[in-house]
């Protein structure tokens, strides 16, 4: 639990201003988002969305969100825009566990194979404000997140940022050296991009970061599809 009131639940987002990038998980980004939300301004509320499945939601006044309950009953995934998420005050999911993946095709496969049996979310690149709002609600609900990121410098950095940001229990999901070895491709990573791995500080990610640096190639999540579907 974060101890914050629903109106104070804010995330962070990427914003380009005067050619400077605001980190979506930085304090500066959070302050900016907080100011906009308190003013009732939703930035890019249509294209700013998150993709989720099997998550129940309640509005800030305490009434269930009928639409989300319907999607849960059908076991279908749904793309929820920021304008809807901003009205939520609470969420919950099966077994208090939320599986998060980067790749939309992996998300779709999990939703199809595990329909109605587990909650899942697709981050799909840099975290949008909508995704961060959902993470804040998940933390308040005592939900544990299991995060599977991409096996390249950008993917590892996003994974680390999300885990560090999350206020509840969190774990890296299939992010080991063994997983990378199984997923690796022939796609070369430039030296400039490999240098980004120096910013990996979480001890749990250091082994895979070092292996990616040694081999200099990216890994494809699609090659781990059976592991993701197994949900272990």
Task: Show where each model-derived region lies.
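Acidic beta-strand-to-loop metal/phosphate-binding motif
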Residues: 142-152
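Nucleic-acid enzyme cleavage-core boundary/entry regions
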Residues: 1-122, 127-140, 154, 161, ...
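Structural alpha-beta junctions
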Residues: 165-171
């Amino acid at each position: 639990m974060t101890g914050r009131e629903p109106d104070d639940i804010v995330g962070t987002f990427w914003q380009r201003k005067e050619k400077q990038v605001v980190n979506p998980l930085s304090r500066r980004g959070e302050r900016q988002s907080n100011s906009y939300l308190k003013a009732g301004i939703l930035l890019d509320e249509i294209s700013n969305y998150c993709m989720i499945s099997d998550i129940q939601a309640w509005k800030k006044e305490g009434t269930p969100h009928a639409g989300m309950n319907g999607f849960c009953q059908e076991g279908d995934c749904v793309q929820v825009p920021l304008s809807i998420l901003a009205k939520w005050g609470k969420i919950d999911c099966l077994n208090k566990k939320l599986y998060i993946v980067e790749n939309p095709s992996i998300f779709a496969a999990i939703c199809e194979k595990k329909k109605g049996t587990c909650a899942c979310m697709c981050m799909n690149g840099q975290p949008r404000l909508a995704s961060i709002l959902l993470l804040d609600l998940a933390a308040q609900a005592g939900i544990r997140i299991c995060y599977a990121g991409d096996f390249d410098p950008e993917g590892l950095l996003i994974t680390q940022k999300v885990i560090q940001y999350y206020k509840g229990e969190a774990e890296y999901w299939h992010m080991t050296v063994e997983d990378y070895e199984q997923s690796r491709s022939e796609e070369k990573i430039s030296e400039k991009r490999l240098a980004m791995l120096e910013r990996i500080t979480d001890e749990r990610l250091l082994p895979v970061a070092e292996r990616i640096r040694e081999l200099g190639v990216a890994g494809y999540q699609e090659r781990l599809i059976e592991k993701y579907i197994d949900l272990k």
